[in-house]
Each structure stands twice: as C-alpha cells, then as structure tokens.
Amino acid sequence: MRIIYLISTVLLIYTNATVLRTKESIQNKVTYDKYGFQPLCISCTGLISVASFFLKFDVSEPVILEFATIVCKLFAKQPWAVCDGISSQFRDEFFYVFRRLANESPSQICGIILPDCADPTDPSESGWMVALPPKPKRTRISKKKVQKKPNMSMSQNLNVLQLTDLHVDFEYKYPSEANCDDPVCCRVSVSEPKKAAGYWGSVGKCDIPFWTVENMLSHINKTHMIDMVIMTGDYINHVDWEYSIEEHLSVLRKLHRLVQNTFPSTPIYWALGNHEGVPVNSFAPHSVDERFWPTWLYKEFQTMSGPWLSEGAKDSLLKRGSYSTQVMDGLKLITLNTGFCEVTNFFLYLNQSDPDSSMSWFVKELFESEKKGEQVYVLAHIPPGDSECLEGWAFNYYRVIQRFSSTIAAQFFGHDHLDYFTVFYEDMHNVSSKPISVGYASPSVTTFEYQNPAYRIYEIDPYNKFKIVDFTTYYADLEKATEDKKPVWEKLYSARQAHGMDDLSPLSWNKVIQKLFTSEKKREKFYQYAFRNFSPQCDSTCQMQLMCNLRMGHHNSTLYCPTF
C-alpha cells in the first residue's frame, strides 16, 4: 500500500464539499505564487511523499488517521471533533480508493484531484465521451393529445413547486448560540449567547428547524394550487462529521411524511443531493466493492417517490440513483444523480468514465422521448457548471443538452443555495453563439449560509411544449419573525416582471445577462434576489462568481465571466 488518507486533508482544506464549504473547488484553487510555483500542488505531492514514507515503515492506519486529523486541525482550523469525525467518516473509503492508486506517482495522483497539477497520465479517464445518436426525423405531438392526468388540476396552466436544499436540523435549539466557532451553529443551548438564535431560524451558519419547514408547507398548501412538487436534493443538515445511515433514514422519513401529508394527492418527485451520502458526497458506483454501494439510500428513495414511479423507474433508481417517469401525456421527467459528478466522491478517481452508465442511460431516455415528440424536464441537484462538479461529467452533460435542446423543456437544480440561472449555448466555447437552453438554480430553504429561506413556483403551459411561462420566488424575512410572531411568506419577485422579459426563452435569458453585465443597478437587484433580501458580505469576488454562473455550463475557462 503506497497511498494514504493524508490526501484527504488537502481535500478537506481546499474543497467546498466538506464542512469547510469554501464555495470554491480545488479545481479553482491552484494558483501561482510570485516565484511561479504552485503551493497547493507542492503541498499535495509533499503530503503523499510523507505518507509513502510512513507506509514504507508499516505505520498503522490509525496512526496515519491521527496524523491527518492533526494536519486538518492545524490547517483547516476546525475543532478536534470535526476533524476527527471526518477522519472516521472517510476512513474506509479513502484507504480503499488510494490503495488502488498505489502504482501512480505522487504527481499523477495530485493531477487526478487537482487538474492544474496534471501529469500527462490520466488513470481516472476524466476525458471520457458519451456516444450521441444522430438526429431522427422529428414527429410533432398534437396539442389535442396533451391531457392532464386525473391528479392534476384543470386550470389552463400548471403550477410546479420546487423545494431544494432544506437541510433540516432536528437538533436546532432555541435559544442557542448563532455565532459559534463550529462550522454549524444554533445547536448548543447557552444562557447568554453572543448572538441568539431565532426561534424560526437564523440567517448565518445555521440550518433550518423542522417547525419552520412545517410552517412553510402549511402556508404553501393554504395559499397556492400546486399540481406537481419537485424536490432537488440536500435534505440533511450540514453537520457531516456526524453522519450516519440510521440518522439519515430517520430524517428522510420524517420529511417525506410531512411533504406527503401536505400534498396527499399531488405527484412528488425526489432527487438525490450530495448531502444524502454517508459519508457526505459518497456515491459508490457498482464498479467498486458492494460494501460501499448506497443501496440503502436508493431503496429509501424508491419508497419516497414510489407512488409515482413505474417498476422500470424503480429499477433504474436502485441501479444508479436516477430515474425517468411519465408525468403526463407528452412530458417525461428525468431525475439525475449528480453524486456521480461530485468532485469529492473519491470513488470516481478510480474511473470517472460514465459511472453506472448514467450518462448513457440519460441519452437513451432523451432519444426515446425525441422519437416520440415528447418534452423532457431534467431534475438534478448540482448544476454542471458548479465548481463541485467534475469537468468530465459537466462537459458530457453540456454535449447532451446541445444534442437534445429541442426535447429538453427545462432543467431544474439546487445545491448552491443561491438564486440564479445558467444559459447553455450552441457552441459551449462561444457565448456569442445561439442560446439553446436554460438551467434554473432555485434558492434554498435553509439559511446556511447567510440568506433567508425561500421556495419557488413555476407556471407551466401544458399546451405549448410545457414551456415555463413565468416563475415566482417567495421568501420569509426571519429577522422580522419571533417566537410569538410567525414568519410571513411573501413574494420576492417574478422573473418576467423583475427582468422585463417577454418570455422565458433561452434568448430572453441571454438578453437579461447582457443587461446585468452592463448595469450596476440591475446587478445590485440581482444580488438582492440571490440572497433573498438579506445583505450578506458579498464582496467583488462573490459578485463576480454569481455573474460567471449565468453562462458557466461547464468549466472550460473564464471566458464566461464579465469584464466590468
């Protein structure tokens, strides 16, 4: 055995997928100092060399883990409980993966994880390409054939509710400290907190209490007519150093029961988020040992979405965490497991090439819909252009969107907790080319970190290729809520009104981007929407990243970013 858990320390310090949640990936962290060196690459190879020395002298795994915990404590500046918990969580996974990379040199291993440190060798096959079929003769579906299912309302347009990134914390305490030194606060009761946690939640390093989610769903049920609910992942809190399968199942079942009871006759579709993994971000493909397979999780999601899925869809969910289902005549919904693009899903570094054939399956489902003249909604958690998504997966996803842009009516994402959208182009390397599709990243329910809770409702025209006519985002200002005064859920904005749009076509969204890039006033309003009327410390780097997201469908370069 020539490789180590120590590399995990580099990842814990430099990626956003862990408790540190820096909002920047290791892919964007490789920089040069004034002498032309790459400190992160040097640190990576240095740690692996140290580990090789340890292992050469048969140092035991527990000792290596303890050393990794110490390094985590010193460099990541996290409490012992956090570093020790992460070490325990990832122990088996790390040793399993890195033992199988034993024949690779330190520079090759660092090149796998940090692309800008890349060695010419690519043992993980990150440059894989999914096969795309030629375009067939298109058959048009008649408007007369489009009929709502009995469980849908008979209104002209349909209302689709999106809830994402709930991150419910069943250990939320009131009163408690909201400004603590731990990665997640509002969990420890204190008599005199420096900053007291609010009863309904606290905007900051805190997740949302269960009773606030109950309040939100009750409000939605009383206020809106909902025809379909889409859940785009991350239902578990951010205390990922304490994750367990038993606790995950308990949270998922409580949340499923609440949502199901709120909308007993409404179709509800659930997607997996990276925080559903145990350890966090861990989604083992079937190419690794069976003991790592997240079968327990896939089975639970079978139960959660069960009433609305066919047996074939359930089988697909159990195989890859993804499924497709016929929502109504002329409309298919495809739910993708983006755990297979997660940059800290370490199993992928053994082989990134189409884990569990998910991308090939995605293409097959789209091709079938294309031949039938159907429209498709894509439901997933991590947007492909997010820094937490591997470029190999993002690049192939973008290619699929290009090929099937006339079939894909909309893409729905979560993950970033912020409110934004991404335009996809006919040429992924040229933002002056034709806009062909839009991905919607919906705002989170959780307040982690530093935004008010929100939900979104899309207005859909079922008689015009299931196009999104408009959407409205609602939020609650938790600073105005008290123990005796419930949150007020109110309209934040509607897309067409806020951005002065004639429609929500890719071309119209591209025009919105152009306006945002040239108008500081419009950008300020956009930032306000992104954080739901909360004033965070969003500096110039933060603001630039939000603008880059608008055209960042993958990670090719910074050409997507504005130059203001």
Swiss-Prot record:
Domain of life: Eukaryota
Enzyme class, broadest EC rank: hydrolase
Pathway(s): Lipid metabolism; sphingolipid metabolism
Cofactor or coenzyme needed: Zn(2+)
Stored InterPro entries: ASM_C, ASMase/PPN1_MPP, Calcineurin-like_PHP_ApaH, Metallo-depent_PP-like, Saposin-like, SaposinB_dom, Sphingomy_PDE
Localization: Secreted
Every Saposin B-type domain range: 37-121
GO BP terms, alphabetized: ceramide biosynthetic process; sphingomyelin catabolic process
Catalysed reactions listed for this entry: a sphingomyelin + H2O = phosphocholine + an N-acylsphing-4-enine + H(+); an N-acyl-15-methylhexadecasphing-4-enine-1-phosphocholine + H2O = an N-acyl-15-methylhexadecasphing-4-enine + phosphocholine + H(+)
Function according to Swiss-Prot or TrEMBL: Sphingomyelin phosphodiesterase (sphingomyelinase) that converts sphingomyelin to ceramide (N-acyl-sphingoid base) and phosphocholine at acidic pH. Displays its enzymatic activity when secreted. May play distinct roles in signaling.
Protein name: Sphingomyelin phosphodiesterase 1
